[in-house]
């Protein structure tokens, strides 16, 4: 069935001038999701994308946890994190991603922010020793851009997240656990065995003017 669906998708893709793949071909963050055995014709890797940028930061937190994703797993994840993080003697931050409110709550050494804008989240991530988050691809690209050590907790039932978490765990980049098994002592200990994300590897240089020349040529025509 998967092969049939792939053939149908590739036939539809073939009608376009190019197929852009959001990954770095040499680094291959997404594993077989961006590098299957067979690629569509006229495919082009355009590198990874992130809203964040590297900045100088002072370490403020031992751990920053980021909640995201659909309900009901979002709330389950949030409650589990609060339960374990509020018991820690270390300074920690929990970002809930709830855009409908801007509230701050403190429980012992845990600060809970209902919402952080992109700039504040960028700063928070870089001021922490370790990140806990879901393993969605956009999150992974952000963590890679900022060269962070992370523990990935895939949303149960989301096969893409489960694959990416396992793939990066096998590559010894990120430790990964199920949300029911979150244990801070174990997380801190196990995360030391993983390298974290690094931008030090040679990346494919993307010429954006060449990519967007497709649209310029179409406009001229």
Task: Name the predicted role of every residue range.
Residues 32-33, 101-103, 139, 159-165:
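Short, glycine/polar-rich helix-capping loops at beta-to-alpha or helix-loop-helix junctions
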Residues 115, 145-194:
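Nucleotide-sugar donor-binding patch of glycosyltransferase catalytic domains
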Residues 8, 119-120, 139, 183-186, ...:
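Short acidic active-site motifs
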Residues 18-20, 44-46, 93, 111-113, ...:
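Hydrophobic/aromatic beta-strand patches that form the interior of the parallel beta-sheet core
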Residues 35, 47-130, 140:
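Donor-nucleotide binding loops and adjacent catalytic segments primarily
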Residues 120-163:
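A donor-sugar binding/catalytic signature common to diverse glycosyltransferases
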Residues 185-221:
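C-terminal amphipathic helix plus adjacent low-complexity
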